[in-house]
Structures are given as C-alpha cells and as structure tokens.
C-alpha cells in the first residue's frame, strides 16, 4: 500500500526492515535466504545480500583496467517473506502489543518476536 503526503513520490509501507532475515518466495532466486541490506521506500523494493545478483561491465578509464562487477539488484518487497533462523521457516508478520505497551512485529507461524 502506497501513501503520499501531498508532495513527491509515493512511499510504500513495508513489512520488512533493514537487518531482517528474509526468504525469496518467487522468481529466479526462489528459496534463497539473506539479510535486508537496504530498503527503497519510493520504489517499493529491498536489496537482499546475495540475492538477485547482476553483472556490470565497467570500461577502462584512464589508467584503470576494465572489470566486471557483481552486485545485488533491488527486488520487490512483496517477493520476500520474513524468515526465522531458529525454526528455519518463512512466515507472515503480525503485530501485537507487549505488556510494556510497545507495539512489536511477530512471526505468525513461530510466534517469534522480531522487534526488541
């Protein structure tokens, strides 16, 4: 769901945050697990370590040699699911309020609390 505060591009609402462990649920990298290294709110995408690798060819510049670079490309956030390292299982996310009154994210299948 996108929200727009009247100016600029729409910002998407995310179920994942930087540092979360996620599993890819569709596409060429289906089943791969990695950490979210960056969140791109205006594009609705995330960058996951070791997933959606692309090769970039760099031409020689002056005294530098040409080379090929491998880097992660963004992937839509709807194509990833939060992943429990303890149970080795992907799960949807839910929200609950703790006894201290703090709203936290919880994995629905395992009951694991994500926010500390």
UniProtKB/Swiss-Prot annotation:
SUPFAM superfamilies, alphabetized: Translation proteins SH3-like domain (SSF50104)
GO cellular component, one term: cytosolic large ribosomal subunit
Positions of region (Disordered): 1-21
rRNA-binding is among the record's keywords: yes
A GO molecular-function annotation: structural constituent of ribosome
GO BP annotations, alphabetical order: translation
Family membership noted in the UniProt record: Belongs to the universal ribosomal protein uL24 family.
Name of this protein: Large ribosomal subunit protein uL24
